[in-house]
């Protein structure tokens, strides 16, 4: 017998929690370094097949800022707020919701629970929050983003359980600074004086003793790159104690290998990117539970705006006009979740109240005739080889994604065939680590992956701001973390109107007005940028054995491990 749960998220409110960029590179990535080792089942552990295996554990760094890293490390590092599946905030370390204490200057005060402590029994205090803030703002540290933190002019520790943040101006999404999985509070007493860029790459531990350290229900017991990460209960956790003996994450980065490992009992749980026919495969496994919901992850087609050809906005508009997004939805994601549909917004998901179909200016089914007319008017002439050319530049581009992801590979094929009809040649060029190397090194031309949205789009400002264009560095250098950069504007687009609207949204406290501002941002992106074309809102797909109970998917960046302390496990032997 199997059990299936198909759900559509409850409606998001206009102003709520953040999706830090973990979101960003996070859910976007499908495959990390592929392991040659076959996963081995452990009857005393829950074994999870991980599509994206973390290269490092420090989730604040660009190299570690992936959703799988967040789902693995997140249960070890508590945050001010826990982000719930309905996208509401629940105070976690905080004893209550942080409060606005003054409008001029804009000041927010937060109070900690008095019983919060680290796994070594040292109290977790406001000094740890201050240390985390200082670490993020230290220009020597490679952090994924400083957005929001850079609006704080003073961070005042009032007492061990109280701190105060004074902002340059009104900053509406202040909760977001302490709610994302990339904002787990850091232990000052073990990390002070350490090299942040290296200290937690291979362990979440006290660097002096190598003893695991944490403040959440689990601890990271061990990490073997490309092989496994093991997390175990934190015996000194101040909240509800976890009862699972341990959870072992192993890399299973190929779509077919993942379901085969699940069917063979080599792994007990999988949380794959959407794959064609995967729902039926999971449901066919005896004793399996399948769950799917429409989360904040959204698939998109990106064009690097500095590439010759793509530097012409008319070319980008023609491609947006031709893209058969409805066909992609029908063939790639519809069987995973019946509620899947074309996404016409980069700031809000389809079931969020502020959602407006701003990208419907481009027909969902794709219009080849209209796209050809745009290119004709822009002077791009069709050559004898069927490829358009202008001033010696051919409209011939590579299109990459994470190799081994059959759903994305099908999307590529659909796009390739359609764009051929408008004189645009697409050559597919994939790699397992394309996001961690090629994309961040700007060694790509076009690409398909997914960002993670949020109830309040502030968390993804770094995708759109011109000041969030990272330093261009060599792919090999990027992979090992030797680039001094932050931000995620990987299409290198500059749109001053977007910058102005985002700055205005940050200081607007009225949720209705903020929602309107972000829709204005989206309309600018759809008409005057056109580098990131939304395809669809991704359904989550979670499969697990019915020997595990208490599992509840969380479509935020926290993922399915968000309530790991509620899991129970009936060992198989």
Predicted regions and their residues:
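Extracytoplasmic/peripheral linker and loop segments enriched in polar/acidic and small residues
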Residues: 39, 329, 364, 373, ...
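N-terminal lobe/hinge region of extracytoplasmic solute-binding protein
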Residues: 49-103, 134, 213-214
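Gly/Pro-rich hinge or "lid" segments in bacterial periplasmic/extracellular proteins
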Residues: 74, 85-88, 182-242, 368-369, ...
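Ligand-site clamp/hinge motif
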Residues: 113, 206, 233-281, 413-416, ...
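Surface-exposed binding/hinge segments that line
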Residues: 146-197
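Structural transition elements
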Residues: 218, 340-384, 403-410
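Ligand/substrate-recognition segments at binding pockets and active sites
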Residues: 225, 380-454, 511, 537-540
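Long beta-strand-rich cores associated with HINT superfamily self-processing modules
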Residues: 542-573
């Amino acid at each position: 017998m199997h059990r299936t749960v198909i759900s559509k998220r409850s409606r998001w409110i206009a102003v709520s929690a953040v999706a830090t960029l973990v979101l960003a590179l996070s859910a976007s990535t499908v495959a990390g370094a592929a392991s040659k080792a076959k996963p081995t089942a452990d009857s005393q552990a829950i074994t999870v097949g991980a599509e994206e295996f973390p290269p490092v554990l420090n989730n604040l760094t660009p190299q570690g800022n992936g959703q799988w890293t967040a789902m693995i490390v997140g249960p070890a590092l508590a945050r001010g707020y826990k982000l719930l599946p309905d996208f509401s905030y629940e105070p976690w370390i905080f004893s209550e919701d942080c409060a606005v204490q003054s409008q001029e200057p804009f000041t927010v005060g937060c109070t900690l629970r008095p019983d919060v402590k680290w796994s070594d029994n040292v109290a977790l205090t406001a000094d740890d929050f201050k240390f985390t803030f200082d670490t993020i703002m230290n220009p020597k540290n490679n952090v994924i983003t400083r957005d929001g933190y850079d609006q704080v002019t003073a961070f005042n520790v009032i007492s061990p359980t109280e701190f105060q943040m004074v902002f340059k101006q009104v900053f509406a999404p202040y909760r977001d600074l302490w709610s994302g999985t990339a904002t787990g509070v850091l232990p000052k007493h073990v990390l002070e004086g350490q090299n942040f860029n290296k200290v937690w790459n291979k362990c979440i531990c006290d660097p002096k003793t190598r003893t695991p350290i944490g403040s959440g229900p689990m601890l990271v017991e061990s990490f073997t790159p490309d092989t496994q990460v093991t997390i175990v209960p934190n015996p000194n956790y101040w909240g509800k104690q976890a009862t699972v003996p341990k959870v072992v994450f192993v890399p299973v980065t190929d779509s077919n290998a993942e379901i085969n490992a699940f069917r063979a009992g080599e792994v007990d749980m999988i949380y794959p990117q959407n794959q064609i026919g995967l729902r039926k495969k999971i449901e066919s496994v005896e004793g399996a539970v399948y769950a799917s919901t429409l989360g904040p992850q959204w698939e998109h087609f990106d064009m690097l705006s500095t590439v010759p050809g793509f530097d012409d906005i008319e070319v980008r508009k023609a491609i947006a006009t031709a893209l058969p997004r409805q066909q992609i939805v029908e063939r790639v994601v519809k069987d995973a979740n019946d509620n899947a549909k074309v996404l016409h917004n980069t700031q809000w998901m389809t079931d969020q109240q502020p959602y407006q179909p701003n990208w419907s200016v481009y027909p969902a089914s794709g219009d080849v005739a209209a796209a050809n007319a745009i290119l004709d008017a822009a002077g791009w002439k069709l050559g004898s080889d069927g490829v358009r050319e202008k001033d010696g530049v051919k409209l011939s581009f590579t299109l990459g994604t994470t190799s081994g992801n059959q759903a994305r590979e099908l999307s590529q094929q659909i796009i390739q065939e359609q764009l051929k009809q408008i004189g645009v040649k697409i050559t597919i060029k994939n790699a397992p680590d394309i996001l961690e190397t090629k994309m961040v090194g700007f060694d790509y031309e076009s690409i398909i992956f997914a960002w993670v949205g949020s109830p309040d789009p502030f968390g993804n400002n770094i995708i759109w701001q011109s000041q969030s264009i990272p330093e261009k560095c060599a792919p090999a250098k990027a992979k090992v973390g030797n680039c001094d950069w932050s931000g995620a504007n990987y299409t290198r687009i500059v749109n001053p109107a977007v910058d102005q609207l985002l700055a205005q949204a940050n200081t607007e406290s009225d949720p209705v007005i903020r929602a309107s501002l972000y829709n204005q941002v989206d309309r600018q992106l759809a008409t005057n940028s056109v580098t990131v074309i939304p395809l669809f809102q991704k359904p989550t797909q979670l499969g697990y054995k019915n020997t595990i109970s208490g599992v509840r998917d969380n479509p935020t960046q926290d993922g399915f491990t968000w309530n790991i302390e509620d899991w129970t496990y009936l060992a198989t032997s």
